[in-house]
């Protein structure tokens, strides 16, 4: 999808405020919902993914299972709200051995397991809004001893609220981020 696009800085694949936030995503829902709502904490539109079973309610990008993202930027950033329920996300990458590897992070696992094609790992979320920064290059090297080439697919499972999902060429400090990539919490009146 993005293979022939110039990639530097930031590349957003989901923005909850956009007119069609799931335009390049496919949705799977079983005993749950995927809808845009207004989050009370940030007083803004977010995408809520809720489901009885984490594995059967999710969004995946790209929507076409025969296509790949082709994103070479090595940092994946998710701005996610912890709903204090089971939650996971998955990223499929291509390495320099031409092998497709998956990384799955979840808040219900306690140990990291590395198998030939999938690495599952625990993730701890703070209460409320979180910015998850995932160094794909580093994880590929540490788990498999190979080099990251590109991201093929991203999948986000229930249960969470999403503000934005983007890729970047490096980690940026809060001051360096463009305003639309920051999560602003409204000022509380006392």
From Swiss-Prot:
Its job: Cilium- and flagellum-specific protein that plays a role in axonemal structure organization and motility. Involved in the control of flagellar beating in an asymmetric and planar waveform. Stabilizes outer doublet microtubules (DMTs) of the axoneme and may work as a scaffold for intratubular proteins, such as tektin and PACRG, to produce the beak structures in DMT1, 5 and 6. Not essential for flagellar assembly.
Keywords carried by this UniProt record: Cell projection, Cilium, Cytoplasm, Cytoskeleton, Flagellum, Microtubule
Subcellular location per the Swiss-Prot or TrEMBL entry: Cytoplasm, Cytoskeleton, Flagellum axoneme; Cytoplasm, Cytoskeleton, Flagellum basal body
Pfam families assigned to the protein according to its UniProt record, in alphabetical order: CFA20_dom (PF05018)
GO BP, sorted A to Z: axoneme assembly; cilium assembly; establishment of protein localization to organelle; positive regulation of cilium-dependent cell motility; regulation of cilium beat frequency involved in ciliary motility
GO-annotated cellular components: axonemal central pair; axonemal doublet microtubule; axonemal microtubule; ciliary basal body; microtubule associated complex; motile cilium
Principal subcellular localization: cytoplasm
Induction / repression: Up-regulated during flagellar assembly.
UniProt KW Iron-sulfur keyword: no
Name listed for the protein in its UniProt record: Cilia- and flagella-associated protein 20
Transmembrane segments: none
Family of the protein in this entry: Belongs to the CFAP20 family.
Mutant lacking the gene: phenotype: Exhibit erratic movements with cells continuously turning around the body axis. Display longer and sharp kinks flagella. Flagella beat in a uncoordinated and deformed non-planar manner. Lost beak-like strucure projections in B-tubules of the outer doublet microtubules (DMTs) 1, 5 and 6.
Gene this chain is encoded by: CFAP20
Top-level taxon of origin: Eukaryota
């Amino acid at each position: 999808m993005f293979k022939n696009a110039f990639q530097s800085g930031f590349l957003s694949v989901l923005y909850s405020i956009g007119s069609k936030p799931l335009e390049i995503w496919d949705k799977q829902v079983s005993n749950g919902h995927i809808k845009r709502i207004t989050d009370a904490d940030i007083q803004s539109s977010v995408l809520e993914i809720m489901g009885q079973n984490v594995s059967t309610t999710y969004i995946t990008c790209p929507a076409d299972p025969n296509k790949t993202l082709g994103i070479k930027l090595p940092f994946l950033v998710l701005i996610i709200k912890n709903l204090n329920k089971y939650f996971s996300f998955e990223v499929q990458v291509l390495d320099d051995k031409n092998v497709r590897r998956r990384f799955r992070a979840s808040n219900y696992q306690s140990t990291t397991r590395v198998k030939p094609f999938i690495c599952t790992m625990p993730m701890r979320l703070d209460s409320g809004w979180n910015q998850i920064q995932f160094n794909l290059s580093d994880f590929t090297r540490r788990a498999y001893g190979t080099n990251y080439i590109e991201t093929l697919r991203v999948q986000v499972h229930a249960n969470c609220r999403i503000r934005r999902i983007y890729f970047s060429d490096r980690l940026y400090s809060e001051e360096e981020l463009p305003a639309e990539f920051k999560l602003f919490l409204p000022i509380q009146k006392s």
